Structure formats: structure tokens, C-alpha cells
């Protein structure tokens, strides 16, 4: 199943808000790293994250890329990108060691 996130009420959100999510089963002693596109359009890496992982980002004007990539050695990962209205705009539900969601 595609990952789901529960964004706060959209009335207070910028239309440029995106929600990144990574779900799955993290194996004992495995490390899950996540790379996502930040507000300026640059990649940011978070190391050894807990699952489920979510991040809210308000993209600067002109930033078009919405991306989250999760990697591991053994874990089974899925990812998703939701827009400000909470709609899933891209998802990967492959339960694999790498999950890529880019729009």
C-alpha cells in the first residue's frame, strides 16, 4: 500500500508545501538514509532515520523538483510525496532496499 501521511489542515499551508514520507520495515542493525529536496531545491541527507519518517517542506518560488529517496542494506522501504491538499502525487510501494519518489 502507498505510504500515507496526515498533513495538518490545509487552510494554514502554502500551496508550495510538500510532505515527504518513507515507510517500511527497518531491519535490526540496518541503517536507513533519506535524501530529499529542500526549500531551495538542494538535496539534504538525513542519516539513520527511524521509520515511519516524514518531512514537511515549503518550496521556494521557482523550485520545481519534489523528491525523496530512501536507501538501506536490508530494509523494505516505500515512499510518497503529498501536496499541500494532502493528495498523494507520487509513490513507490515496491518494498525494496531503495525507494525513489520524484516529481
What do the predicted segments below correspond to?
Residues 23-72:
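Mature extracytoplasmic domains of secretory-pathway proteins
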Residues 16-24:
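A short, amphipathic beta-strand motif
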Amino acid at each position: 500500500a502507498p505510504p500515507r501521511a496526515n498533513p495538518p489542515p490545509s487552510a494554514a499551508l502554502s500551496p508550495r508545501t510538500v510532505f515527504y514520507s518513507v515507510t517500511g520495515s527497518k531491519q535490526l542493525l540496518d541503517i536507513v538514509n533519506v535524501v530529499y529536496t529542500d526549500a531551495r531545491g538542494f538535496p539534504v541527507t538525513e542519516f539513520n532515520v527511524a521509520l515511519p519518517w516524514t518531512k514537511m517542506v515549503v518550496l521556494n518560488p521557482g523550485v520545481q523538483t519534489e523528491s525523496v529517496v530512501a536507501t538501506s542494506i536490508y530494509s523494505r522501504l516505500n515512499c510518497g510525496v503529498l501536496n499541500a491538499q494532502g493528495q498523494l502525487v507520487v509513490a513507490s510501494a515496491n518494498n525494496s532496499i531503495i525507494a525513489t519518489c520524484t516529481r
